[in-house]
Amino acid sequence: MTADDWLPVGKVVAVQGLKGELRVNPASDFPERFTEPGSRWLKARGQAPREIELTSGRQLPGKSVFVVRFAGVESRDAAEALVGQTLMVPADDRPELAEGEFHLLDLVGLEARLSADGDAIGTVKDLISGGNDLLVLERPDGRTLMIPFVEAIVPDVHLEQGWLRLTPPPGLLEL
């Protein structure tokens, strides 16, 4: 499988406790990827993804972080070896969406405009997931901006046409 055959859904960011549990920062809007048992894949930098069985998971109350347990990872030492790896699923394992919905990673590559007939003011290069999702926007001059992905600032997404509309507050584009 090539890199395009995989979809990153989270990053292992820390160990939780002494019995092999791990904290995962999600890059997916589908919590079942972290709570429903089944096959997942872990990818270390410079290596191919390797299959691992998710046995359980839960979201920490009031946080966007999940605590997961993988088969065969029974100690803190075993868990620490997985910190920094990316949790993956096959790219064709995307949940069905309702009309008007989209997968956040589909925003990468879209042009950002201030109006439907306006010129592109940048291109979405990445997405940072956390408490609030951020679009990483590359300007034509090479500068990079972080744009909060909230409806007030990104009211329209036109995947089929390859662009999204921004309504930034004063000063956001000058940062």
UniProtKB/Swiss-Prot annotation:
Matches recorded under Gene3D superfamilies: PRC-barrel domain, RimM
Disulfide bridge partners, by residue number: none
Keywords annotated in UniProt: Chaperone, Cytoplasm, Ribosome biogenesis, rRNA processing
Domain PRC barrel: start-end pairs: 99-172
SUPFAM superfamilies the record matches: PRC-barrel domain, Translation proteins
Gene Ontology cellular-component terms listed: cytoplasm; ribosome
Family: Belongs to the RimM family.
Function: An accessory protein needed during the final step in the assembly of 30S ribosomal subunit, possibly for assembly of the head region. Essential for efficient processing of 16S rRNA. May be needed both before and after RbfA during the maturation of 16S rRNA. It has affinity for free ribosomal 30S subunits but not for 70S ribosomes.
NCBIfam families recorded: 16S_RimM (TIGR02273)
Assembly description: Binds ribosomal protein uS19.
HAMAP family the UniProt entry points to: Ribosome_mat_RimM
Protein name: Ribosome maturation factor RimM
